[in-house]
Amino acid sequence: MRPRKRRMVDFEHPERQFRPFSPESEISEEILLTIDELEAMRLSFLENLSQTEAAARMEIHQSTFQRALKKALEKVTDALVHGKAIRIEGGDYRMPRGDRTGPAGQGPAGGGRGRGQGKGRGGRFGGPEGNCICTACGYETPHTPGVSCSQVKCEKCGSPMVRK
């Protein structure tokens, strides 16, 4: 059996678990979505890249990207339809820098297996143009290409910002 090629991941979501809002019942089942599967969905649907472009960004073949995207969509659909929790962790991935840091200079890269590998958010590609908005006070500033909004602190209150 051929070894799996580690995928290039340029973003890692700060949240690791999503659960249905259901105060009356306990969530008994959980779906595991790998970090590289989440990256496939992000590149395809949020950055609106073609499968060929997204596969190139992840440094994998287009057919491998297509399988990862299909698997991710099946998992998320199953969780939404059947009220299951989604846990994000693991997968075979690496972050862009070769000095064991992620795209924003945070956390280890390299190993790429399991929780805690490849920490870091944002990245060199920067995504489409737009604004960063403060989660606390609502202050907006233009997005700087190549700098993740999550790495920008609000000029007014110092809170982290998110992409609008």
Swiss-Prot record:
Segments forming a coiled coil: none
Biased composition (Basic and acidic residues): 91-100
Gene3D superfamilies assigned to the protein according to its UniProt record, in alphabetical order: Homeodomain-like (1.10.10.60)
Positions with biased composition (Gly residues): 104-115
Listed Pfam families: DUF134
InterPro entries, sorted: RNA_pol_sigma_r3/r4-like, UPF0251
Residue span of region Disordered: 91-123
Tree of life domain: Archaea
Membership in a protein family: Belongs to the UPF0251 family.
PANTHER family xrefs: PTHR37478, UPF0251 PROTEIN TK0562
Protein name: UPF0251 protein MM_1448
